[in-house]
From Swiss-Prot:
Function: Catalyzes the acyloin condensation reaction between C atoms 2 and 3 of pyruvate and glyceraldehyde 3-phosphate to yield 1-deoxy-D-xylulose-5-phosphate (DXP).
GO molecular function: 1-deoxy-D-xylulose-5-phosphate synthase activity; magnesium ion binding; thiamine pyrophosphate binding
EC number(s) per entry: 2.2.1.7
Organism phylogeny: Bacteria, Bacillati, Bacillota, Bacilli, Bacillales
Species per Swiss-Prot/TrEMBL record: Bacillus licheniformis (strain ATCC 14580 / DSM 13 / JCM 2505 / CCUG 7422 / NBRC 12200 / NCIMB 9375 / NCTC 10341 / NRRL NRS-1264 / Gibson 46)
Xref: InterPro entries: Dxylulose-5-P_synthase (IPR005477), THDP-binding (IPR029061), Transketo_C/PFOR_II (IPR009014), Transketolase-like_Pyr-bd (IPR005475), Transketolase_BS (IPR020826), Transketolase_C (IPR033248), Transketolase_CS (IPR049557)
Keywords: Isoprene biosynthesis, Magnesium, Metal-binding, Thiamine biosynthesis, Thiamine pyrophosphate, Transferase
Family under the similarity heading: Belongs to the transketolase family. DXPS subfamily.
GO biological process, one term: terpenoid biosynthetic process
Residues annotated as binding thiamine diphosphate: H72, G113, H114, S115, G145, A146, N173, Y284, E367
Entry annotated with the keyword Metal-binding: yes
UniProt name for this protein: 1-deoxy-D-xylulose-5-phosphate synthase
Amino acid sequence: MDLLSIKDPAFLKNLSNEELESLSAEIRRFLIETLSESGGHIGPNLGVVELTIALHKEFDSPKDKFLWDVGHQSYVHKLLTGRGKDFATLRQHKGLCGFPKRNESEHDVWETGHSSTSLSGAMGMAAARDLKGTNEYIIPIIGDGALTGGMALEALNHIGHEQKDMIVILNDNEMSIAPNVGAIHSMLGRLRTAGKYQWVKDELEYLFKRIPAVGGKLAATAERIKDSLKYLLVSGMFFEELGFTYLGPVDGHSYDELFENLQYAKKTKGPVLLHVITKKGKGYKPAETDKTGTWHGTGPYKIDTGDFVKPKAAAPSWSSLVSETVRKLAREDERIVAITPAMPVGSKLEGFASEFPERMFDVGIAEQHAATMAAGLATQNMKPFLAIYSTFLQRAYDQVVHDICRQNLNVFIGIDRAGLVGADGETHQGVFDIAFLRHIPNLVLMMPKDENEGQHMVNTAVKYDDGPIAMRFPRGNGLGVKMDKELKTIPIGTWEVLRPGTDAVILTFGTTIPMALAAAEELQKEGRSVRVVNARFIKPLDENMLKEILNEGLPILTIEEAVLQGGFGSSILEFAHEHQSYSPIIDRMGIPDQFIEHGSVAKLLEEIGMTKEDVIRRIRLLTPVKTHKGIGS
């Protein structure tokens, strides 16, 4: 079959199971070949081929609603709904999104990227369906990893209480990105080995009906026996007690089992949970045998060997630099512990976990819990390092405010993937953290210009004993600069002048410093002398240096790879307003008031006007203007 010519999933209705098996194999070959060139979430998608095909054959999308939790496993869904012809553009600028996208297809009814949201969305859709009097099926598909998220458990509780008709597909592959952890994961493990729940339940019901209805103590004893037998023999009682009809576990690669149970679920009133066992990476040995999460999402790779295509002589990643520096310091300070919400591989904490297993806590997809657990550790004079992506820190905002900063606890927050991340798009860009952190009392916020300064900032954060401190660092590799052998501490709230200048000042930090220096070099050729300041402390500001700059009356350009509204540039405007009686000449560059889609970071920066050429253009506009004299002149 020509996968690129598929227009909609209606053709599946006429295929036999044997033909579906052939289609499954063809889709897997297509995914393995295509993703070897572009990269993407190969592991999750290889695992849900049969499940996705079965869902589209049994139900009628888009009338029936599929909600793909997290959404990285939606590639097969995209192929079956007519987007194969655009698959070569996957995760590229203006191309197919790597996650469900409502404006991309009518079959994408729920946008995702973060985990554990599908059940709440499904509850809303089911409530709307019932209010409108329609009869479509609502089918959220959630992984066993996402099920550990608190929001998913809140939704299970509410759905069970409301008894809305809904078919929840639990896609159980024993992993989220890294292997799953926690009591719920252990419970699901017991379910996997317990056999067919519905068969056992039906047999028990038959047995119970044969117990004679008698009065008094004997009747009460019989009821207790029934209840005890249920809990002893039927592991699905967890979901049943929440109000769900539990079906499974089902082989997620068997069409016979999938169709039998989906048809049973369609006839069942109230919420149903169908427990489907799948193999992440199925059909491609390197991905299928992956135990660490390496093949969850990848860059390009060689199909025959499974080797990843890496840039030559790349510097170590920022995640490695930070985690390894923390690991080094942990050898000297037994109070240092590390916490990650299900991202030990992405945060490069495998080495720390191997050396200090008792001081490493992977709490699962539970960012709120991770933040407050860090606070609890800090109250006992421990030194918690909370490794978390910028985009996921959004989910723990209240805990950072209420539990960490309000109590002024010594928690080191390592904000990974800060700034634009590229191909994962809107849901993963790390551009909001400055705006939602800098106004919180007690918190120090900083970002290094390179990996050498980065290791010193990690040391500074670990040695800091006056409250919470956060360090932003980008996705990808460092610049390859020379590294100091001895770690230093950087005075809190101090900036540094990287290049002198007398006509204008650029205040920036982190990833935008090389661009600012390159622009200043070009402008020097035109006779414009531009000072470049490494404003490495976003909070607190270096007030002494900033006052000196304002007193000089020079025009200022702030640059940040983060949202402008409420960001670093805003803090400079606020400071200038509070300390001067006139409006200073200050221009700001940063992320505009919009969600930034997927594409290469370079392409995205070009699109929003954050290139070296844009810096040069803005400085040219600033420098001809006659500047005011500063305070005390």
